[in-house]
Protein backbone atom coordinates (compact mmCIF):
# COMPACT_ATOMS: atom_id res chain seq x y z
CA UNK A 1 0.00 0.00 0.00
CA UNK A 2 1.29 3.45 -0.90
CA UNK A 3 1.67 5.79 2.08
CA UNK A 4 1.18 9.48 1.35
CA UNK A 5 0.81 12.52 3.54
CA UNK A 6 0.28 16.16 2.77
CA UNK A 7 1.22 19.14 4.90
CA UNK A 8 -0.85 21.48 7.03
CA UNK A 9 1.01 24.77 6.83
CA UNK A 10 -1.29 27.78 7.02
CA UNK A 11 -3.47 27.98 3.94
CA UNK A 12 -2.43 24.56 2.60
CA UNK A 13 -5.62 22.77 3.59
CA UNK A 14 -6.02 19.61 5.61
CA UNK A 15 -3.32 17.06 6.34
CA UNK A 16 -4.12 13.83 4.50
CA UNK A 17 -2.84 10.53 5.87
CA UNK A 18 -3.61 6.84 5.62
CA UNK A 19 -6.27 5.74 8.12
CA UNK A 20 -5.76 2.98 10.65
CA UNK A 21 -8.37 0.91 12.50
CA UNK A 22 -7.62 3.11 15.53
CA UNK A 23 -9.37 5.98 13.67
CA UNK A 24 -12.71 4.15 13.82
CA UNK A 25 -14.29 6.21 16.60
CA UNK A 26 -13.44 9.59 15.06
CA UNK A 27 -14.49 8.51 11.56
CA UNK A 28 -17.70 6.93 12.81
CA UNK A 29 -18.60 10.30 14.37
CA UNK A 30 -18.40 11.77 10.84
CA UNK A 31 -20.29 8.86 9.25
CA UNK A 32 -23.15 8.49 11.76
CA UNK A 33 -25.06 11.66 10.72
CA UNK A 34 -25.01 10.44 7.11
CA UNK A 35 -26.68 7.19 8.25
CA UNK A 36 -29.20 8.87 10.56
CA UNK A 37 -30.09 11.92 8.46
CA UNK A 38 -29.64 10.95 4.78
CA UNK A 39 -30.15 8.05 2.40
CA UNK A 40 -26.68 8.18 0.80
CA UNK A 41 -25.22 5.29 2.83
CA UNK A 42 -28.06 2.79 2.28
CA UNK A 43 -27.59 1.72 5.92
CA UNK A 44 -30.47 1.59 8.39
CA UNK A 45 -28.41 1.54 11.57
CA UNK A 46 -25.20 3.24 12.61
CA UNK A 47 -22.50 0.58 12.90
CA UNK A 48 -20.69 0.01 16.17
CA UNK A 49 -17.15 1.27 16.62
CA UNK A 50 -15.91 -2.33 16.41
CA UNK A 51 -17.81 -2.94 13.15
CA UNK A 52 -16.36 0.27 11.74
CA UNK A 53 -12.85 -0.70 12.88
CA UNK A 54 -13.23 -4.00 11.01
CA UNK A 55 -14.44 -2.21 7.87
CA UNK A 56 -11.37 0.03 7.90
CA UNK A 57 -9.02 -2.93 8.40
CA UNK A 58 -10.71 -4.91 5.61
CA UNK A 59 -10.53 -2.00 3.16
CA UNK A 60 -6.85 -1.38 3.95
CA UNK A 61 -6.01 -4.94 2.91
CA UNK A 62 -6.34 -3.84 -0.71
CA UNK A 63 -7.34 -0.18 -1.06
CA UNK A 64 -6.40 3.24 0.29
CA UNK A 65 -8.41 4.62 3.21
CA UNK A 66 -7.57 8.26 3.88
CA UNK A 67 -8.22 10.70 6.73
CA UNK A 68 -8.17 14.49 6.41
CA UNK A 69 -7.13 16.25 9.62
CA UNK A 70 -7.02 19.81 10.85
CA UNK A 71 -3.73 21.26 12.10
CA UNK A 72 -4.69 20.16 15.63
CA UNK A 73 -5.30 16.55 14.53
CA UNK A 74 -9.13 16.57 14.44
CA UNK A 75 -10.63 14.35 11.73
CA UNK A 76 -12.40 16.54 9.15
CA UNK A 77 -13.31 13.82 6.68
CA UNK A 78 -12.29 10.54 5.16
CA UNK A 79 -12.30 8.75 1.84
CA UNK A 80 -11.72 5.23 0.69
CA UNK A 81 -11.92 2.99 -2.34
CA UNK A 82 -13.43 -0.43 -2.68
CA UNK A 83 -14.22 -2.94 -5.39
CA UNK A 84 -16.75 -1.76 -7.96
CA UNK A 85 -17.89 -5.36 -8.46
CA UNK A 86 -16.54 -8.69 -7.26
CA UNK A 87 -15.85 -10.23 -10.67
CA UNK A 88 -12.22 -10.54 -11.75
CA UNK A 89 -12.69 -8.29 -14.79
CA UNK A 90 -13.39 -5.40 -12.39
CA UNK A 91 -10.06 -5.69 -10.54
CA UNK A 92 -8.93 -2.28 -11.82
CA UNK A 93 -12.26 -0.52 -11.26
CA UNK A 94 -13.00 1.11 -7.91
CA UNK A 95 -15.95 2.60 -6.10
CA UNK A 96 -15.10 5.74 -4.12
CA UNK A 97 -16.67 7.04 -0.93
CA UNK A 98 -15.99 10.44 0.63
CA UNK A 99 -17.47 11.72 3.89
CA UNK A 100 -16.82 15.17 5.33
CA UNK A 101 -17.75 16.39 8.82
CA UNK A 102 -20.66 18.80 8.61
CA UNK A 103 -18.67 21.66 10.12
CA UNK A 104 -15.95 21.13 7.50
CA UNK A 105 -18.16 21.36 4.39
CA UNK A 106 -17.06 23.96 1.86
CA UNK A 107 -13.46 24.09 3.11
CA UNK A 108 -11.81 21.97 0.43
CA UNK A 109 -11.66 18.80 2.52
CA UNK A 110 -13.55 16.64 0.03
CA UNK A 111 -11.51 17.94 -2.88
CA UNK A 112 -8.23 17.30 -1.07
CA UNK A 113 -9.31 13.75 -0.19
CA UNK A 114 -10.49 13.08 -3.73
CA UNK A 115 -7.26 14.36 -5.29
CA UNK A 116 -5.08 12.20 -3.02
CA UNK A 117 -7.28 9.13 -3.47
CA UNK A 118 -7.19 9.60 -7.23
CA UNK A 119 -3.36 9.80 -7.22
CA UNK A 120 -3.00 6.70 -5.03
CA UNK A 121 -5.40 4.65 -7.12
CA UNK A 122 -3.71 5.70 -10.36
CA UNK A 123 -0.36 4.62 -8.88
CA UNK A 124 -1.95 1.26 -8.05
CA UNK A 125 -3.12 0.88 -11.66
CA UNK A 126 -6.82 1.68 -11.24
CA UNK A 127 -8.33 2.61 -14.58
CA UNK A 128 -11.93 3.43 -13.59
CA UNK A 129 -13.31 5.16 -10.50
CA UNK A 130 -16.98 5.59 -9.67
CA UNK A 131 -19.11 7.01 -6.90
CA UNK A 132 -22.87 7.01 -6.73
CA UNK A 133 -23.09 9.60 -3.94
CA UNK A 134 -24.57 12.86 -5.23
CA UNK A 135 -22.05 15.08 -3.43
CA UNK A 136 -19.15 12.95 -4.66
CA UNK A 137 -20.50 13.25 -8.19
CA UNK A 138 -20.73 17.03 -7.81
CA UNK A 139 -17.14 17.11 -6.55
CA UNK A 140 -15.94 15.09 -9.54
CA UNK A 141 -17.88 17.35 -11.90
CA UNK A 142 -15.95 20.33 -10.57
CA UNK A 143 -12.74 18.59 -11.67
CA UNK A 144 -13.94 18.52 -15.28
CA UNK A 145 -15.93 16.34 -17.67
CA UNK A 146 -13.41 13.50 -17.62
CA UNK A 147 -14.25 12.89 -13.95
CA UNK A 148 -18.04 13.24 -14.00
Language model features with spans:
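Short acidic N-proximal helix/loop "leader" segments that mark the beginning
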Residues: 1-10
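Conserved GNAT acetyl-CoA-binding A-motif
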Residues: 121-134
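Helix-loop element at the rim of GNAT/NAT acetyltransferase active sites that forms part
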Residues: 29-46, 59
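Conserved G/P- and acidic residue-centered "switch" motifs that form tight phosphate/ATP-binding loops
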Residues: 108-110
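A short beta-loop-alpha structural element at the N-terminal edge
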Residues: 15-29
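Acetyl-CoA-dependent GNAT
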Residues: 44-103, 114-116, 120, 124
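Conserved beta-strand-loop-alpha-helix junction that forms the acyl-donor binding cleft
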Residues: 105, 131-140
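Conserved acetyl-CoA-binding loop of GNAT-fold acetyltransferases
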Residues: 144-148
Amino acid sequence: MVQQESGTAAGEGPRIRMATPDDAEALLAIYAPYVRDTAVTFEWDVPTVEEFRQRIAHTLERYPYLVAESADGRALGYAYAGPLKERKAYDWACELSIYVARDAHGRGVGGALYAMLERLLAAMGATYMESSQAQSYALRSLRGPAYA
